Amino acid sequence: MFAQQTSNESAIKKQEAVVAAAQANVDKFEAQLTVADSLISVGNQMITESKSEMKSAENDRKKIEKEYLTSKKVLEKKAASKNKEEAASAKADLKSLDNQYKQDIKHADLRLKEATKKSADGTKNVEKGKNLKKTAGEGLKKARATLEAAQAKLDTMKNPPQEKSSSKKKK
C-alpha cells in the first residue's frame, strides 16, 4: 500500500508539473497578446502623428515657396534698376535669398521625409501587431485547452471518482 501511495504521489507531482508548464504556456501567449496590442496602438499613434507632421511640413513648404516668390519678385525689380548700387545690392540679396530658400526647402523636405518614414514604421508596427495577435490568439486557445485538460486530470488524480468505492460497498 505504501508503494502504491508513493507512486500515486509521484504521479500527482508529475501532473502538477504538467499543469504548471501549461499555465506558463498560457501566460506566455497572454504576454504576446499584450505586446501585440501595444504594437498596434503604438503603430496607430505613429500614423496619426505622422499625418499631422506631413501636413505641417507641406504647409511650411508652401509658405516658404510663397514668401520666396514674393521676395524674389521685389528683388528682381530692384536688380533691374538703373541705379548701379541698388542693383548690385539687390543681386547680392537675391543670391542670399536663393541660398536661404534652398536651406528652408531642404529642411521642410527632410521633415516630410521623416514623417513619411514614421508613417511607414507605424504601418509596419500595426501589421506586425495584427500578425502576432493572430498567432498568439490561436496559441492561447490551444494552451488554455491543454491547461484545462491537465488541470482536470490532476483534479481526478487528487480526488478519485467516488463511484468505484460505493459500488464495492454494495457487493
Language-model features: locations:
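Extended amphipathic alpha-helical heptad-repeat regions
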Residues: 4-171
